[in-house]
Structure formats: structure tokens, C-alpha cells
Amino acid sequence: MEGAEPRARPERLAEAETRAADGGRLVEVQLSGGAPWGFTLKGGREHGEPLVITKIEEGSKAAAVDKLLAGDEIVGINDIGLSGFRQEAICLVKGSHKTLKLVVKRRSELGWRPHSWHATKFSDSHPELAASPFTSTSGCPSWSGRHHASSSSHDLSSSWEQTNLQRTLDHFSSLGSVDSLDHPSSRLSVAKSNSSIDHLGSHSKRDSAYGSFSTSSSTPDHTLSKADTSSAENILYTVGLWEAPRQGGRQAQAAGDPQGSEEKLSCFPPRVPGDSGKGPRPEYNAEPKLAAPGRSNFGPVWYVPDKKKAPSSPPPPPPPLRSDSFAATKSHEKAQGPVFSEAAAAQHFTALAQAQPRGDRRPELTDRPWRSAHPGSLGKGSGGPGCPQEAHADGSWPPSKDGASSRLQASLSSSDVRFPQSPHSGRHPPLYSDHSPLCADSLGQEPGAASFQNDSPPQVRGLSSCDQKLGSGWQGPRPCVQGDLQAAQLWAGCWPSDTALGALESLPPPTVGQSPRHHLPQPEGPPDARETGRCYPLDKGAEGCSAGAQEPPRASRAEKASQRLAASITWADGESSRICPQETPLLHSLTQEGKRRPESSPEDSATRPPPFDAHVGKPTRRSDRFATTLRNEIQMHRAKLQKSRSTVALTAAGEAEDGTGRWRAGLGGGTQEGPLAGTYKDHLKEAQARVLRATSFKRRDLDPNPGDLYPESLEHRMGDPDTVPHFWEAGLAQPPSSTSGGPHPPRIGGRRRFTAEQKLKSYSEPEKMNEVGLTRGYSPHQHPRTSEDTVGTFADRWKFFEETSKPVPQRPAQKQALHGIPRDKPERPRTAGRTCEGTEPWSRTTSLGDSLNAHSAAEKAGTSDLPRRLGTFAEYQASWKEQRKPLEARSSGRCHSADDILDVSLDPQERPQHVHGRSRSSPSTDHYKQEASVELRRQAGDPGEPREELPSAVRAEEGQSTPRQADAQCREGSPGSQQHPPSQKAPNPPTFSELSHCRGAPELPREGRGRAGTLPRDYRYSEESTPADLGPRAQSPGSPLHARGQDSWPVSSALLSKRPAPQRPPPPKREPRRYRATDGAPADAPVGVLGRPFPTPSPASLDVYVARLSLSHSPSVFSSAQPQDTPKATVCERGSQHVSGDASRPLPEALLPPKQQHLRLQTATMETSRSPSPQFAPQKLTDKPPLLIQDEDSTRIERVMDNNTTVKMVPIKIVHSESQPEKESRQSLACPAEPPALPHGLEKDQIKTLSTSEQFYSRFCLYTRQGAEPEAPHRAQPAEPQPLGTQVPPEKDRCTSPPGLSYMKAKEKTVEDLKSEELAREIVGKDKSLADILDPSVKIKTTMDLMEGIFPKDEHLLEEAQQRRKLLPKIPSPRSTEERKEEPSVPAAVSLATNSTYYSTSAPKAELLIKMKDLQEQQEHEEDSGSDLDHDLSVKKQELIESISRKLQVLREARESLLEDVQANTVLGAEVEAIVKGVCKPSEFDKFRMFIGDLDKVVNLLLSLSGRLARVENALNNLDDGASPGDRQSLLEKQRVLIQQHEDAKELKENLDRRERIVFDILANYLSEESLADYEHFVKMKSALIIEQRELEDKIHLGEEQLKCLLDSLQPERGK
């Protein structure tokens, strides 16, 4: 096919081919066998680059076809010409199932490095760097090559982005797959966000689902970061950057420092420009290597062309190294990515230009230092010392034609970790990792300067003056220099390049080279620089070098600690003799730096709080050796440091305050250089002293104190944004004594430290980064220290999480009051945060502080470390399992999610039982809530407004609170703040919230909170706001009341978990009316329903739910549920469904204890059941669908269908295979279920619940045929997604295995289910070989199980989306479902449309599992009754085989139907995209498109990781007691790594959810309700369909395995 012209293809394909023909020949490749195809795509029009196949997986289908080569540009897929967008290509590829036809354009030279190349190859392939962009991963020249390869070398913005993406992909896929497990915790943790994504991606590559595209999907779309640096990939990339700055200092990472990064880049690029293409990059890379070494290989991967030529395309954010850095990345990304991308890029280049002159001048001054130190550094870096040397030699980086690369290098140097830029980075990793050698070399040859130069050639410029000043001062460890440079760059980004340069010029040289990495936090460090406001980035870098002592402490807590140790020890001794380069190279280098820093400004260094050890930990992960050495050394001196820190922190606090004023002044007069330079030096000295002594590099995860300390600082900061800078300086330095460091922004122009929440939020809501930093930063950190402000704000939230007693409203209000910021405060915090960019890092720090505060609370609770770790998703899961105090769980989880990711390796059990705060505050949940609100708004303008108000309030609140807390607040806190629209309801809902917080939260933390996190705002709103606001409406609809009644307790749970229920506007009035009309009878049912739903799910689950409800807000819930339950019920139906889904999502079944899982599932089921209509709940209870209800339901359903017919929906066909009895039962049930002819709005609610009609019969089926019948409900469910709530858990369980039915059983554990399980057990008992597969009691974890807590249950998403899209028309009737039941092979287009593919998939899967169970049960029964057990067993097996075969057929049909749904959704997405593109600004459209692309990637990544993790966990569970410890340990390690990665992916999902909300908000301003509903549906269905597809595949696979096992088991018997 090669060389052959493609056959006639669509015009676009022809065009694509024509384009392809330009640079090479077209090759047609035919792949077959289905996904994964085994190749990774990069670039795309989104990235301004060709869509290139960057990697061909060995042994993959793509590899099987020799014609497909890495570097091929995809021109057409399946005869469809590509428009050039990667997402399009991915969709097409994913849409290809059996065969994939690719038309690729092959150039004589490939511009892409195969993904197979590993980071190690980056260094190995240094010579290759110039040859290919991927090669350039380790070498700057390669970037140029990549630039030309992918785009003009000048179009670095896209080129680096794409190339970076490519590199990232390459790095991710290859390095991730190779290194992810190899460097499970340290590297993953450090580069966790990106690295774990990489690893995840790579792992996922292994995973079939994620394999072909998981890498591409997981690959950070840095390239996308052009448009949206907050994209998952960008976040990843940025996280790397953040990580580097975090290592160097989070402040350098401050998103508020968009220019900081740019200026860093600009400062660095000045050096780089001259030789950036050739020398600077290598040299620069050498420098970045230092930072990169931790990521040694990652660095290069993240190395991105400078894009100096493309100011508009700022360098991609560094890959997230860790949750923290991920959060920081988001923040940084926001500033560096978006701002950097646009304004920052220009500024950066301007700054670069400015910096260059200064750099040139400085180079003259630092000329010698650079030359003297740089040569050695370059030599070390071996990163093309020649090139950078020259630049360094001048002290300025001659603008090279590869200025972009140089700039990139500059940014890399600033965030070496994120972009270890030189081929040397490969070497540097060792240098950095060794850090001792690095430092030794640096020290020996004044590597400080050399290192600094090498590490951040661009900074060298900005640091040139500093260099001049620093002279030998640059001798500081190169890593430190990097950190400082990074910090400087970040600061430069924050500060005008002039300022940065000026500050750098004024910066004391010694510090600059000394603690660059550590300087990232430097904001406090260089008060003068801050005052100067211009070179603070350089201050951060140069000053970081000069005042490096400060910076290093910030940049790398370990280094800072080391520096402090050195400062304390060495400074105290006046020598680093105690710290020997041989014994403690890192500490020695740090000490060297510290000495220099003290020279520069011990005070400042003290002022600069060292970044948390997490920073060090991250660098550590990048360079385990360095981290280990440093950590060991630091730990050795930790006690001393802590002592010093406590002492110095107090001192530094005061000093920091002084510095703060200066910083403020600096901020105000950011251009001051000379005086500020001196003052800055003084401050640096003071800050350095404080930082080194007061702040320790201790990792938060290692030492909870830092959190406490930081919270103190945060308190101060929170107290006074202006003082925040001091607080940042003093606070970090002063963390021990929060009093001294008044509220100092972590750094005014610098990177603020955000909590994981804040970081996540910053990622998802870059525009709120400042807000995140300030509002939440203040609150979170203050809470621990200044309980007044902190408690009021973040502390309150924490307390809320801990006590869950504070009403959510209080929290938002308190936060506002404490902050003294109105709800608008989020805006103000943003302003303040941006004004005090330091605050933003502080926000991170605050978040960290929050985490730490949470830890402190946890510590108080006796689980300080654990709460922090809850931050990780695994921890969240663990926390769900543990069900720790809601406060700690959620706050700590949210705050610590990023940090905890590092701690993922820690036993989740180690972590306190936390409510899945993330899930609770799941961005998607919030988003969905918001969307639901929007939907409701659309549906009912009146309710919609409150809903809108709530979401806005939520967003505002979120802006104030840390991202997760914000989410939690949105769910929990926003009820109060967002209850304002539904203030009327708010009283009751707040009561619910309060009750939930006070009572239910503790119990509901898992479920309720999880639900809250996952529940759509609609639910929350309906739960809380609906009661009062919708009180009339809600109350008027009897059915809604029922639904609420049914849902009320679930809603209560949901409300408990989702105090923000009010966020979701009450169901549209029309909905309540419909409910009134249709649910008049159900209105009475609410009470009964409440009673019934509880019994229905299961006594235990009901009890739990009721208890939670009663605890949380049973009175309110019941009272409001019954009187207000109608709308509430409607909303609650959604809420319940969402709650159940959310509960499932927040509390992955696998994560929760079986009982809890069952309860949750039951609750979900019950909620779902309740949602439909109380009547049905009783029916369920009775297990007999009321005929009258059936009639009503049919009418209602019909109405709903009719109403929904108006809904625009993508046809979703779900093939349900069920027995005729099931069909009949379900039909009859469906009739009762149908009665929920809710008001149109309510229909949507019901649709969301989808249980309204279907769940009813689903319930009925489930209850009537609980054992096997659940399948029928699922089948019925096609018409109603809500049954999926019930189904989904069963599906998941089924996915898990027929025991999946256990899941349903857990929900509805009926006698039949128990019988089925018993029979299955009997069969298993007879044939142990089938135990794993057939034993109902065997819980097989599936991808869906692990995905459960991540995504709001797809059913809910689909329901909401479908509701929005009004898919109910396809639900037209359970009859349709019944017909489908009758014709399982026929896609249940109508009902399935309602259910969406997800439901269809769920139904087939459920049917398959149910049938299997039925057969098993039958077989088991036969066995019981049969005298010949063996014969009976064989017969039963045969029956089971037949049933499974039928189910498999149904599942396959469902898969085909799902494909149709996917295609339909893709079409819808294309339509939506076209609309969005037409109405939205390009930047907004880019955000939309990147979000969509990231959504696909994140979902696939999560699926892949979930699948892999499920397999590992299953393997662990299946390990025999006699299994070798080595095997178990290996699996445990894999599990740990996968859990970390999974948690990282979850954070990505949270970020994605926040981005989704952002995009939704953007689109809401442009799109009509219908279009917006289509968008919501598309987005939700996109992920739901992907998940559903994966679930179907898993179920099919399970069924096939079951069949195989059964057949195999029968053969021996036959042989007998």
C-alpha cells in the first residue's frame, strides 16, 4: 500500500493527502485486530504541528504492519481525511474497531522520535538530538530540529508544544512504561503528575485500552498548552515546571508569575539565544540537567523549544512532577501556560529581549563567573558546553536562531526539572541526582556559577549581573542554581523582565548560583528584588543565586534544609566543613550555597521558607540519588534545622514582615533595582538565614510540621495579602512561628505554594489560580495557625471536614468573612493572589498548609501524616475505606491530594479514614452539578438562576477555597453561599448540610461526601436549595417529593455529602409541575418512598443511608424531602443517582469495604430507585411493581419521553439481552417505572436519574428478579439510565465478575441474589477452577470498579447529558426497552438513547453477568436438586455457558451499538465544536478543544490505569498463600505505583473536571441552552461512552473468560 495513492477518499482526505504529498509520500496502512493499535499520535493542528505517529509499540498491530513508522504524519484515517486535529484522529482511531486504515505522509526524515526512546536515551541519543525532535528531548538542537520537523523552528510555540508533547509522549510512553514501575514512587512522585501520567500512560500503553492512545492521551498536551496550559497535558507539563520550581521553590512556580516563567525564559534565553539552538541548549540542557536529573530523563522530555520566536506560544508548562507540582503547575500553568502562552510569551520574549541586554551586560559582569564556572558546568553537563559556554562566557546568551529553544531552555533551566533541556540533561540527571558530584563540581569549579549557567543559561543572563556580583558565588550547587534560576525565571515571569534583570543585576551573585532550585520559593527571599519587582524572577534566580540561601530553602526543602543545615551548621560554623562534599555532597553544595546566600542575605534566605521537602522530594524523585543523599543528609540535620527553623522562623517571621514591606514596595515599585538590590541582598541574607533556619526542607509527607508551619505562615498571609509576601518569606521561614511572618504572600511576584487542592483548582481554573493561592491559601494555612482567619476560611473548611459540623454556608460565609472578602473575594483573592504572586505559591503552600493543617488536625486526630496523604487518590480511596473524619479526609485529601500522591506509596490504610474529599469535591461532580444546574436552569429558568448562582457561588467559593475544598465547599460549603439563591431552601438544606456535616458527614463522609463530590450541583441544589427554593415547585410535584422522599435520605446523604445541593437549582418549575401532575400519587409516597427506598436497597445500606441521613440531616431531609421532596426528589433523583453514582465514584467499590461498597451500591440503587418514584420504591420493596403505578409510570415515562423527545440527543443504542420473563417483569415494572412522567425539567432529572422510569422497573426487576432479574432492570434501564445507578454497580461487580451481581446484590441483596451467589458458590465448590470467574462471592476488581470513584458514575453523566440532550425521547418507553429485551441483539436505540451507550453497555454487561449468574444459579439449583452433582454441574455449566454466550452476544451487539453511540456522540461533538468555534474566542475554543482532547486522554488514562490496577489487585487477591514473597512484593509494588499513578490520573481528572467547568462556563456565555446541553451531553457522553466501551470490553472479556473456563471445566468432565 505504500506509495500507492490512497483510494478515493473524502475531499478532506484528498486535501490532506495533497498536503501530505508536499513533504513526502503517502503510505496507506491497514491495521486490523482492533484497539489498541499500538501507535501514538502527537501534534495536530491544535498544536500547530502535523499529526505524527510518534511511537509504534513493539509487538503491536501497528508494529505488525511494517509500513507504519514513527514519524509518519497521519493524513487520513479510515478513508477520512484528517483536518489535522489530533483529537479528530484519535476519535477516528478509537472509532475503528476491527480495522484501522491509515494514510500517512512519510517524509524522508522523521521529525518525531519514537516513543520507544526512553529518557535514558535522551542522553544516549544526544547526537540524535539534532536529528529528531525526540532526540532533542535531551538536546536543545533537537528541539530546533523538531521545530523544523513539526513546524518552523521559529514556530516554537507550536513546535515545542507539539514536540514537547511528542517528547512528552515519547517520554511518557517509553519512559513511563519503562520507568514508571522502575521508579515507582520517587520518580513517579516527583514527576508524578507528568511522570506518573507518563508512567501511567506507558503503563496504560501496556493496557490495551489505553495502549494505543493512552500514551497519546496521557501524553501531556503541552502542545495544547498553547491554547490551554491548563489542559491535562499542559498541566502535566506545567507540573513538571512547577515541580522544578517547587524544588527550586514553589513560588517560582507561582502561576501568578506567568512572566516569571517567561522572564525566566527570557532571562535564560538571552543566553540561550546565541547558541540556544546549538550550544545553549546543550549547555542549557546541561544546566537543566541539574534540575532534570531528578527527572533526568524526564527533563529532556519536558524540554521544550524556547519558542522565543513564538512569544505567542509560551513554553509549555513543565510536566506535573507531582500532585503538588501538578497543582502548582496548574497555577503556574495558568500564569505560565496561558499567561505565559499569550501575554507571558510576548512578555517573556520582551523580557528576554530586555533580559538579554541586561544579560549581555551581566554576562560581561558575570562573564567571568560564567566562563569560569560555566565551562566546568558545561563540562559536567556535557550538554554542549561549547555552545552554552559561549553564551555563558559572554554572560549573555547570544540570541541564537534557536532563540525559542534557548528561551525554552531558559524556561527549562528555570524549571529544569520540567524541561531538563540538554542532551546533557541525561547527564545532568546523574549530576543532579548525584548533586553531590554536581555540587562538588560546581563548588570545585565554582560550579555554582557554572551550574547556574548550565542549569539555566537563560537565567544566567538575568543572573549575569548577579553573576557579576555572585562571581564565585555561583559556585553554589548547580541544582540549587537551577532551582534559583528556575525561581528566577519564575520570578522573572512574575516580574517584568526588566525588573527581573534589574533585580538579578542587583542580586548578590553568590546566592544566585547557590540555590537556584531552592530559590524558586524565593519570593520572600529577595524582598528588594520584589520591591524592585522587576528582577525578582532573577531575584528568584539571580538573587536566588545571590540570596540563594533563601531560594534553595524554598526551592528545595531538602536543599533548603541542607542549606539551612549548612547555614545553621555551616553558617554557624562559618564553614561547610561539617558537610563534606564527600559525605553530604548535597548538603555540602547547599551549604556552599547557604554560605554564599548568607553572604547575600541570610535574612532573606531565612525569610524564604524552604519549599516543603516535597519539593526536595520531587527533585529527589527526579534524582533519587540526590534526593536520597540530600534527604539523608537533611534528615541527619533535620533536628538541627527544625530547631533552627523554629528559632529562625520566629526571627524570620519578623524579618519576613520587614521584607514583606519591602516586597510590597518591590511589588509596587517592581522596577527598583539598585537600592532594592542592596536591600534585597540584605533581605536575602535575612531571608536566607530565616529560611535556612526557620524553614526546613522537610517534606510535608515526611514531616507534618511544615504543613503546620506553613499554615501558620499561611494564616499570616491569609490575614494580610500585603503581608503575605512577608508571610511567604517569613512564613516559610517562619512556618514554625506563624506569628512572626505576618500574612505574606508566598511570594509577591513569585510562585505561591498551593495546596493540592489549590493546585488542582489552579489547573482546572487557571484564572482562579491567584484566587486559589490567596483565598484558599490564606484560609488553609491560617486555619492551623490563625484559627481565626484560617478557621473562618480554610480552617473552617478544615474543621468542617474534620467536624463536618460547620454548615457549608458557614464555611463559604466564614471564608468570606474571614477573608473579609465577599463572595467576590475569589476575584479579589485572584487579584490579591496575582498581586501577591507569592501568595499563589502560598496558596499552594496554603494548600499544603491546608494539607498540613489537615495534617495538623489529623495529627491532633492522631493521623497527621495520613490526612495529608489522603490527598492522593489512593489515599482518598483509602480514606473512603478508612472513612476518616470528613474534615481531615476531605480537606486533607483535597489539600494533600498532590502531596499525597507522592505518598501514594504509603499504605492507603495508613491514611486516616477520609471521606473521599476529592470525589466529594470531584471537579466533575462540581462541574456536573454546575452543569446540572445549568441544565436545570435551561430546563427551568427560575431554578436555573439559583442554580447558576449557586455554581457561581460555588465557583467563587472554590476560588476562595482550595480547589478541592472549593469543590467540597461548592458541594458542602457553597450550599450556604450558594444557598443564597435558594436561601429559602438554604435554611433546610443548610440544615442538611449542617446535619450532614455534623451528623451525616462523619458517617456519610464516604458515601455522602463522596456523593456530594460527585453529585451534580443539581442534586445538591435540589437537596438543599430545592427544599426552600423549589419548595413550592418541589413540593407541588408529588412525585418529586416522592423522589425526594426516596431520594431524600439519599439526598440527605447527598446533601450531607453535598451541602451545595442548593448549588444545583431546583428542578425547573415545569419539572415539579409535571411531577405534580404525574407524581401526584408519588407525592404521598415520599414518606413511604423514604421508608421503602431504604428497605429496598437493603436493610444495611438503608440503615446506613438512613443513619447518615438522620445524622446528617435526616430531619431536614425528611422534612424537606417530604414537603419539598418533589423537586428535591427530582433533583434528588438525580442527586440520588448522582449521589449513588457519586458515592460509587468517590468511593470506588474496590476501595470501600465490601459492606460499605454494598451499602453505597445499595444506596445508589436505592437512591436511583427512590429517584424514579416512591411508588416504585414500595413496589421494589414488595418486589411487585404496582399495576397502577405501572400505568402511571408508563404514562409518565411516555410523557417524559415525549417531553424528552424535544431533547436533542445523540442516539444511544443499548442492546439489552434479557429473558422474556425479565422482559415481561421489566415491562410490567417498566410500566410502573414509566409513571414518572415528570415535568419536562424533572424528566431531565429523572433522565439523569434515569431510574425514574427505568429504575423503577429496574428496581422491580431487580427486586422481583433480584438475583438474575437485575439484568432485566438493566435492560429496562436502557430506557432509564438510573437503573444503571443500580446497574452500574452490578455492572461493575459484573465487570468484576458474575460476583458483580454481588454488587447488585450488595445494593439489593435479594433472596434470589443470595441464592445465585450460593449456587455459584456451590458450582465453584464443585469446580474450584471456576471460583475466580464464577464465584459470586469472589470480588474481581475491574476497571470500572476503580473508575467508579473517579468519574461521576457514567450513568449519571449519561443521564445528565442525555437529559440535557433530552435523550428520553429515545427512552420513549420501557416497552422499547422491553422490545429490546425481546430483541437483545437489536440495539435499544430509544431506551438506550436515554440510557446512552453507557447504559446500553451496562445493560448488556449486566445482562451477561446476570444471565451468567442466572445460569449459575440454575446450574447450582440443579446441582442441589440433581442427584448426580457432577452431571448437574456439567449441565449447569453448559447452561451457564449458553447463557454467557448469549450474554456475550448481547454484549457484542451492545458494543456495536455503543460504537454507533460513540459515532453519534462524535458527530454531536463535531457539531458542538463547530458551534463553539464559531461563537467562542480562539483561546476559548482552544480551551474547549483541549479539554475535549484531555477528557479523552484522561478517561483513557484512568481506564488504562484502572484496568491495570484492577488486574494487579486481582492478581494480589488471587495470590495463593504459598505465593512467593517476591511475587507478592512485586505485585504490591506495581499496585503501589499504579495507585500513585491512578491517583495522579484522578487528580488530572479533577483538574479536567475543573477545566470542564471552566469551559462550560465559557460556553454557557456563548451557547444556547440547547447547544450547551448538547455540549454537556457530548462531554459527558464522551467519557461515559469511553468508559462504557471499556466496560463492555471488560465484560465481554470476562464473559469470554468465563466461557473458556466453563468449557475447559466441562472438557475434563466429558473426558471422564
UniProtKB/Swiss-Prot annotation:
The modification Phosphothreonine is found at residue 925. It is found in: Apical cell membrane; Cell junction, Tight junction; Cytoplasm, Cytoskeleton. Residues 128-159, 183-229, 247-475, 502-678, 695-790, 802-869, 881-1100, 1115-1184, 1268-1302, 1363-1389 are annotated as: Disordered. Residues 312-321 have a biased composition (Pro residues). Keywords: Actin-binding, Cell junction, Cell membrane, Cytoplasm, Cytoskeleton, Developmental protein, Membrane, Microtubule, Phosphoprotein, Tight junction. Residues 26-108 form the PDZ domain. Residues 186-197, 220-229, 842-854, 975-994, 1159-1176 have a biased composition (Polar residues). GO terms for molecular function: actin binding; actin filament binding; beta-catenin binding; ligand-gated sodium channel activity. Residues 150-159, 247-259, 343-356, 405-415 have a biased composition (Low complexity). It comes from the Eukaryota. Residues 1317-1611 form the ASD2 domain. GO terms for cellular component: adherens junction; apical junction complex; apical plasma membrane; bicellular tight junction; cytoplasm; cytoskeleton; extracellular exosome; microtubule. Residues 358-370, 754-770, 821-830, 926-958, 1068-1077 have a biased composition (Basic and acidic residues). GO terms for biological process: actin filament organization; apical protein localization; brain development; camera-type eye development; camera-type eye morphogenesis; cell migration; cellular pigment accumulation; ear development. The modification Phosphoserine is found at residues 231, 313, 325, 413, 851, 897, 921-922, 924, 974, 1036, 1039, 1171, 1173, 1297. Its main location: membrane. Coiled coil: none annotated. The keyword Iron-sulfur does not apply. Residues 684-773 form the ASD1 domain. Abundant in retina and melanoma; also in brain, placenta, lung, kidney and pancreas. PANTHER family: APICAL PROTEIN/SHROOM-RELATED, PROTEIN SHROOM2. May be involved in endothelial cell morphology changes during cell spreading. In the retinal pigment epithelium, may regulate the biogenesis of melanosomes and promote their association with the apical cell surface by inducing gamma-tubulin redistribution. The ASD1 domain mediates F-actin binding. Interacts with F-actin. This is Protein Shroom2.
